[in-house]
Amino acid sequence: MNIIAIMGPHGVYYKDEPIKELERALQSLGFQIIWPQNSVDLLKFIEHNPRICGVIFDWDEYSLDLCSEINQLNEYLPLYAFINTNSTLDVSVHDMRMALWFFEYALGLAEDIATRIHQYTNEYLDNITPPFTKALFTYAKEGKYTFCTPGHMAGTAYQKSPPGCLFYDFFGGNTLKADVSISVTELGSLLDHTGPHLEAEEYIARTFGAEQSYMVTNGTSTSNKIVGMYAAPAGSTLLIDRNCHKSLAHLLMMSDVVPLWLKPTRNALGILGGIPKREFTRDSIARKVAETSQAQWPVHAVITNSTYDGLLYNTNWIKQMLDVPSIHFDSAWVPYTHFHPIYQGKSGMSGDRVPGKVIFETQSTHKMLAAFSQASLIHIKGEYDEETFNEAFMMHTSTSPSYPIVASIETAAAMLRGNPGKRLINRSVERALHFRKEVQRLREESDSWFFDIWQPEEVDEAECWPVTPGETWHGFTDADDDHMFLDPVKVTILTPGMDEQGNMSEEGIPAALVAKFLDERGVVVEKTGPYNLLFLFSIGIDKTRAMGLLRGLTEFKRAYDLNLRVKNMLPDLYAEDPDFYRNMRIQDLAQGIHKLSRQHDLPGLMLRAFEVLPEMIMTPHQAWQRQIKGEVETVALDQLPGRVSANMLLPYPPGVPLLMPGERITQQSRAVLDFLLMLCSIGQHYPGFETDIHGAKRNEDGVYQVRVLKHAC
């Protein structure tokens, strides 16, 4: 970061000549100089080039107006105003809080001024670099000889082998120098929360509005287990979202606790709704306790916020209503909600403390922000036992944590601070909104069919759109007022074939075809439903990527309308079974899969599969204990009724458990099995469309098999 912007020239010698001298002096110190044509040009430069580290301008020409506009973009950026003896310095005490320095126009002072600018630039870079990352950068630059782990010794070992050299050249020297041992005392300890690691935790907590934050280097799957192991002791009961991530299902297998399921809604499209308000009432919880063996009043609750499809809760209502001492919001998909006003009141850390309750929020920093994979955070607000919690933290944390991941977590937080952070999130929201409008425009202009978007009819302004009772766009028949809200950056594209109420048309285009088409053109879909595709507009999505997706959708329509051969349109799919797809055209394939969905009454089957939960014969923990003792056997999927499942079964998409360990499918919950068998049948009819079902394995004959407990009824 070495770019200085200079506003000028001014057409007068006494101003232009000192600036020319300063330009030469700055270049000799390694700075790159750019010359914006005017203030509009400058502001565009700053907005789109974060590597600019200073602005030089004439005070008489631009004064505080320019400073204020720059501060809206980056309040930390150093500003250098040049004045003459007649300049009026109408600067208030508040204005002096800006990073603003004054210099006089004079010849012969260029080197001295350049030295000062170099100093202020270093201070700026030091100021925006968070504490642990700064310490890690410093250590990596020192190049100390170490006789401890890791064995690659800052990458030296890699350069002693041809494959190692390839690895070194790909990742680069700094990445490997930053991969250091916990033996480096000046970097402190992640496990003991000392030194720069402690400073990083405090820095992150301030940034995210938490009272305490913990950095986790092996994903939110682990963060969820840490919180659960602390909050729900053996023998206790907890409330848990049935839409939970499988890491929470694994927590139930690890901990001897009794789960009470909070049952969410779904619409006919298969989009996951939230947990309705009625599930949070004392009466509802009391009924669950009374109906569940060994259950007591719950000590802890786990809510998935947001849902996979981007629905956020009014978390302030939940925190006040839910009568449990400890609430965990699994917010893996929304680590950005603290940084834009449209998300106010929709995150775990929003608002003040709730008397008598502790609030936990886990976030996958890597999912939608700029952090390395497995980067995760735990935020806490409320009273808790810090020493006991840290035991749970250490229980699940490696004694050799990845310091590059730690630095990436902290840097992700640094990127969100101040006006630059707000602008970063706002740009993501605006880009998603623009994309939504473009799809709407193309749909309106199309003379036949085009894709639709799951959203209200009017989306003129950026907001979290409420899922309001009585409106038809969302497809939820029993929506609650002021409860669930659609996140604008989670964009769900709808394909023809089914509407939000589950009415299936004569013809349709299953979303899996579109996903395969896009994938072959370098566009990867986050989630594919029967007739919908989910795209995430994270802060890394730029205009080029958004336009690439739009182009991919229009190219699919063009190819589909031409009814191209599968061989030409989807060559990777064709390669799965050339004999089967040899003469097939894309419309024949689409209508074949669509016909299967209609025959099985897909929307009705999906709703029934999630309407009645299977019977819990034993807790997931008890079922796991039976499994590790070897008390399991394998049966075909269609033999599952009446047997107690040893594993969780969850199809992708959407990755939500249909059957938990210790549960049994009964006649009342038979739709669970019918739904799974329907998913399997599509892959049996059409090669390349096999369903991924966690907990079920497909043998060589194409039969899905599952594990059940022996002698359990």
What are the functions of these language-model segments?
Residues 13-30, 39-57, 64, 70-72, ...:
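Non-catalytic terminal extensions of PLP-dependent enzymes
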Residues 36-45, 58, 65-68, 76, ...:
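Conserved PLP-enzyme active-site core in the AAT-like
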Residues 163-254, 260:
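Long, structured ligand/cofactor-binding scaffold of large enzymes
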